Amino acid sequence: MAGEADDAIAWVHLSDFHFKTGHDYGRDEVQHALLEDIAMFAGKRDPARGAEPLHLDFIVVTGDIAGSGTADEYVVGERFLRELAGVAGVPADRIFPVPGNHDVDWTRDMAPFLREHIVGRERVEEVWKTPASRRSVFADKLAAYRAFVSRLNPQLRIPEEQPGGFGHRVPRS
């Protein structure tokens, strides 16, 4: 925030958007209200309100960006998050998404993976032994999420490239 120490960090944490195509059940109104609130806090509206504008360093979006992990849902989500970034005065590469259970496309068939990789108890234990091997079970089911992240913020580590973690070191802006 303006007036605070230069090393202070300001961010917005959002979660559970469940972006979908089709009927939105009032989602547009809620998202519009969120954009209005962010615009107000970022000083883009109502300059007479008496408070200094909030300078945001980044936006974190945790879990359930999509409704069911499909590519079309991420198109909707990306469009909104880019609009949010513009209103907040934050570059899109300062948006940090983290997937949730709805970001996994559970409709994708696991049978081919199971047939190819799991034969007997020892093999099952081997697959679940490390974060990297566990991540491989879901890599295909996170394909739409990975494509979304690559478009939104290409510098991020994404599951297939960094098995076992979604961390990212954020330089100060």
Tell where the protein language model's regions lie, with residue ranges.
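Extended active-site neighborhood of metal-dependent phosphoesterases/phosphodiesterases
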Residues: 78-173
